[in-house]
Design a protein with these regions (language model features):
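Phosphate-/nucleic-acid-contacting segments
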Residues: 145-185
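Cyclic nucleotide-binding regulatory module and flanking cytosolic helices
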Residues: 1-28, 84
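Short, Lys/Arg-enriched N-terminal segment that forms or immediately precedes the first helix
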Residues: 5-7, 131-140
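Cyclic-nucleotide recognition modules
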Residues: 69-129
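A residue-level structural signature of the nucleotidyltransferase/glycosyltransferase Rossmann-like core
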Residues: 48, 103-104, 162
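Short phosphate-coordinating micro-motif centered on Lys-Gly-acidic
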Residues: 38-43
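Short, Lys/Arg-enriched anionic-surface-contact patches
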Residues: 80, 137-150
Length: 185
């Protein structure tokens, strides 16, 4: 089992080391292969998945077997069928890995515990707002962009993500050296 580290998710940056040690047991590490389903329609949904690495898509499949993608989730984003999660109902959506993906998941009960015990409601509210904005932008794109423009927009996001990961992984020394190097430029 992979041990969760404080630098794995932005969520943990706002916590003291003591708080991190207390919150760590609530998160369950799960690894998925490209093509795996994290959530399938008609399943109970009792977890939120925070993406450590990889790429997933959340989609709906209609009665004619047509697939409509609702969202993509990258590193440090979270995803689930939120309606099913919060209403304790069966999923109508599918969450599938487009790449090999690592996640840290939170069970519904644990999600509520950490919201209250660690005062993280503001963090999850901001995540929700960012997700809502991304959904609105996606809907606008669907309504106004050609298939080619939609694909180009997706590629820009993917390229930006890869560049961000390159920068993140570029320097492996102490953080204090990184901050000093940033100031020198």
């Amino acid at each position: 089992m992979t041990q969760i580290k404080k630098e794995d998710l932005n969520l943990f940056n706002r916590l003291t080391n003591k708080q991190f040690e207390e919150i760590k047991p609530y998160f369950e590490y799960q690894k998925f292969k490209k093509g795996d389903y994290i959530i399938s329609e008609n399943e109970s949904v009792n977890k939120i998945y925070i993406i450590k690495s990889g790429l997933v898509k959340l989609y709906f499949r209609d009665k004619n077997d047509n697939e409509s993608i609702l969202s993509f989730a990258f590193e440090d984003w979270w995803e689930t069928d939120f309606t099913a999660f919060f209403n304790n109902s069966k999923s109508v959506l599918n969450l599938q890995c487009i790449e090999d993906t690592e996640t840290f998941c939170l069970h519904f009960i644990d999600y509520n515990k950490i919201i209250n015990e660690f005062k993280l409601a503001d963090y999850f509210l901001q995540k929700s707002i960012n997700g809502h904005i991304a959904s609105q932008n996606r809907i606008l794109s669907l309504l106004s962009n050609s298939p080619k423009e939609k694909y180009e927009q997706f590629l820009k996001i993917k390229i930006h993500r890869k560049e961000k990961n390159k920068q993140k992984n570029k320097y492996k020394g102490p953080k204090s050296f990184t901050r000093n190097a940033d100031r020198a430029q």
